[in-house]
Amino acid sequence: MNAFEKMTHQLRETLEQALSLALHAKNPEVDLPHMAWALLINSTSILNQALNKMGVDKSALELEAKSLVDRLPQSSSLTKENIKISKRLADSLTQAEALGVKGGDKFIAVDTWLLANLKEEPLKSLFSKYLDVNELKKNLESIRGGAKIESATDDENLESLAKYGIDLTQKALENKLDPVIGRDEEISRMMQILIRKTKNNPILLGEPGVGKTAVVEGLAQRIIAKEVPLSLQNKRVVALDMSALIAGAKYRGEFEDRLKKVVEEVKKAGNVILFIDEIHTIVGAGASEGSMDAANILKPALARGELHTIGATTLKEYRKYFEKDAALQRRFQPIFLNEPTINEALQILRGIKERLEAHHNVTIYDSALVAAAKLSSRYITDRYLPDKAIDLIDEAAAELKMQIESEPTELSLIKRQIQRLEVEKEALLMEKESTHSEARIKEIQAELENAKERQRTLLAQFENEKAVFNEIASIKAKADELRRESELAKRSGDYNKAAEIDYGKIPELENREKELNTQWNRMQESGTLLKNAVSEESIAGIVSRWTQIPVKKMLQGEKEKVLGVEEELRKDVVGQDEALHAIARAIKRNKAGLSENNRPIGSFLFLGPTGVGKTQSAKTLAKFLFDSDKNLVRIDMSEYMEKHAASRLVGAPPGYVGYEEGGQLTEAIRRKPYSVVLFDEIEKAHPDVFNILLQVLDDGRLTDNKGVTVDFRNTIIILTSNIASDKIMENSDKERRESAVKAELKRYFKPEFLNRLDDIIIFNPLGLAQIVEIVEIMFEGIREKLKERQITLELTQSAKEQIAEVGFDPVYGARPLKRALYEEVEDRLAELILEDKISEGSHVVFDAQGGKIIARI
């Protein structure tokens, strides 16, 4: 067996990488510089692990290795097949084989090859230029740790913990973790479990985003700050990366081998607490036919207390994976993490504010933090605090940073204006000389001069603002770095340095920042192109974008619009002032922030005969609130007359057809949480439908077939019914009519349903005077259709009255009116258009004559 056959997989992969580098550099032979370069660009190689331990910057070494490759002979016509291995490289492999045999290895590993050739040229000159070669040797030997290479994969498991884990205590030492605010009780309970003799493995259970990982980071920070019991001091918290463990495990048993090596390394170290995030992934991880999964490999060590492990997963995954495996479940002690309150979330946001400001180079107002906590809790109901509030702040800051780093809108507009004028000027210069062209060129020249002057002014203002802004950002970054240095100095006992930073350098920077902020405020008074702070409005804008709920503070124009809601609704709905007044009151309460937090904006039952405007009122309301009726969720209750149909609102139960599709009501509101929901002809629905509606009307929430809660607090619920329409028609006296209607309602609906409604509104029967008004509204719709063709229409008063008489029926309300307009107006218009009697620019007048409607052009 020659040296090439005795190489480990890692050394063979390095040689293949070196071959590719030689081909790319057009070198006919693979040589030592190619091997060195291949090892340096492989971030997981043993060489890079050693360099990281030494704190050496490998970028300079990479450049040096590349320059060595560039000096090698080149050939123009090369393929992978005709590249050879140089004699120097072949000899180096032979030397490595001899060194390996001497050390008891059966295969040549990467570190053996390095150790055998570090004192040979060109590797000696390459490494000695930037580091101590003897120290590199010591680090390579310490990574090996005396292990023997007995198989081709053995060198993959050297320093397994460093390769497959992230040292959180090291990150805490370097101040790279965000501060952990609160959660003292949970951290204390976790430490208590870790100190136990056996089964000392806590598992953090909580919904996604409540801060399970942050609690472990908090423990790492306390270990560094020595704020833990004596038995936990000097411990290391290492987060295990399960995906890295599984990735690249090509051969059977390779994953188990890697995990066993990690477990052995943890046992050997004695001071490592292993953290496995999403710990449910260990169940079944790496298992294939005839092999064990990660959970079964870890169980014995967990039970004996040899392995300190902290797990983190959601309650749902814990039930699914752990509760089914009692042997695994009993090895972990659960710690439940509840979602923090708004005030607790606010404290967390204040704690990480400085880090976010330093990252994005912006200022975050405290009002923005308060808005993020409150608005996320109120409107983003499918996620959990503090994660959703942090996301809001982060996205708002990122949006602001993007605006700062881009060209201001005013400058972009002027630039485009200058380009347009330049193009127009060139086009005119190419034309033959004419008086008109010359005059226009002079105009363009004047406009260009003005635009360029304006551009220069704005550019100077922009540069000035950016200079102030960049200096503020630089000061924030420096202050953040100094705080980190101060913390490290305190930990190492260098209190003189810490005092110098805390009482000298940082206050100096803070004073300069105050001066710059004062300067910035003065600039803002005269109007700035840049905005440097995340405000309450920024957060509201992000919430609106995520949820389609208009959360932004009302501008004056919108306030006027809301105050005029009743008049706006009356434009489309005639003769129902009482109904429109009740709807308007509910909208005003909501817009003023006075509506109840745990109920829909409003819930109404519209009663009245057919054709009086019940459904039209709902459509008009949706159009008013959203400028279109697309946010009207209309559910025809005649489709829900059978018992089995009621489940379609929330979705079919598991095992039934349509389970995956979800509910027709719940899915519609999940997509558009700010909607008008119309339950048309509610009296036709099966009684089970009312049981579903009770929860919506009372709590503003509904749970669908998958157990997901859907929020109805931003909806307006409207139910329409023809119940007691005969009583409404018979009684002209308001009090008698209302008592008759209430008596009729009690026969159809349960008291608990009626009591949950905000208002029961009776729509009045329409009279001839109201029908005439409706004729004008409907005729306006016909006008709109012909506006594009520039055909104008006019309807005389006598024609309106004639159509109203033809289309009026007290029993059917305004519905026959549409048919009357079709027959008397639209049919005539269609004939005139098809006969080419009217065309663009025509004016058509409809009038009544001799009891008939005539058209005059």
From Swiss-Prot:
Keywords: ATP-binding, Chaperone, Coiled coil, Cytoplasm, Nucleotide-binding, Repeat, Stress response
Binding site for ATP 2: 608-615
Stretches for region Repeat 2: 85-146
Cellular location(s): Cytoplasm
Gene: clpB
Binding positions for ATP 1 per the UniProt entry: 206-213
Protein name: Chaperone protein ClpB
Start and end residues of each stretch annotated as NBD1: 159-339
Residues in coiled coil: 390-525
Domain notes: The Clp repeat (R) domain probably functions as a substrate-discriminating domain, recruiting aggregated proteins to the ClpB hexamer and/or stabilizing bound proteins. The NBD2 domain is responsible for oligomerization, whereas the NBD1 domain stabilizes the hexamer probably in an ATP-dependent manner. The movement of the coiled-coil domain is essential for ClpB ability to rescue proteins from an aggregated state, probably by pulling apart large aggregated proteins, which are bound between the coiled-coils motifs of adjacent ClpB subunits in the functional hexamer.
